[in-house]
Amino acid sequence: MSRLRTSHALRTAAALVAVGCLASGCSSIERLSQIGEQPKLTAIDNPTTKAGYKPVSMPMPTPQPASYNPNSLWRNGSRAFFKDQRAHQVGDILTVIVNITDKANIANETQRSRANTEDSSITNFFGIKKVPGTNGAGNMLTTGSVASSDGKGSVVRQEALQTNVAAVVTQLLPNGNLVVEGKQEIRVNFEMRELVVAGIVRPEDIQSDNTIDSSKIAQARIAYGGRGQITDVQQPRYGQQVMDILLPF
């Protein structure tokens, strides 16, 4: 009897583990296989070969034929006497200076009130001069309503991020603008910090030292986060996240 109970308990535990794995996804299985190990660095790969990659398509001006001066020592876009050292073609590297200091303070207040009263009277209701239970057929309907609304809201946010990251030119648009993407991973003990920068850069905004400020990147996508033990502790459990979405209260 004890063996049957033990086997039944083991089957129940296995079923619960399977249900938990299905509820939390395949990521839980991967995390279980990495218990006691540091987060692994992702392999360096070509961003254009990733699943879901789509080349950037933007409105372009009409192409203009290039003009050449045969007796000139300079060429268009040159910033040095011999050669322009800035990134200008696919595969080149430039440094993105990420300097974000955002501060927002928003306050809203709304007040509404409305009062409504309606009286309806009938002098003759199908020849009936007096309705049973009333003094007459006059005031048949009287309605009144009062509504009021008072709402207040405020948002206070302050963010700061200062760092540098090298980005690679992944695409050259027909008008000369560059599509750049950079990723940086820093592992400290059992926590991995990730920084991703992507966007469209105008070659004229690249400084002589081959750097560009993040504020001059169009369609900028900047993400800074992490993964590891500290991030796992800060995130609520999968079951709690599901209950937060489903419970209406």
From Swiss-Prot:
A lipid is attached at residue 26 (N-palmitoyl cysteine). One of its GO terms (molecular function) is cytoskeletal motor activity. The keyword Disulfide bond does not apply. PROSITE patterns: PROKAR_LIPOPROTEIN (PS51257). GO terms for cellular component: bacterial-type flagellum basal body, distal rod, L ring; cell outer membrane. It is a lipid-anchor. A lipid is attached at residue 26 (S-diacylglycerol cysteine). It is found in: Cell outer membrane; Bacterial flagellum basal body. InterPro entries: Flag_Lring. Belongs to the FlgH family. The basal body constitutes a major portion of the flagellar organelle and consists of four rings (L,P,S, and M) mounted on a central rod. Assembles around the rod to form the L-ring and probably protects the motor/basal body from shearing forces during rotation. This is Flagellar L-ring protein.
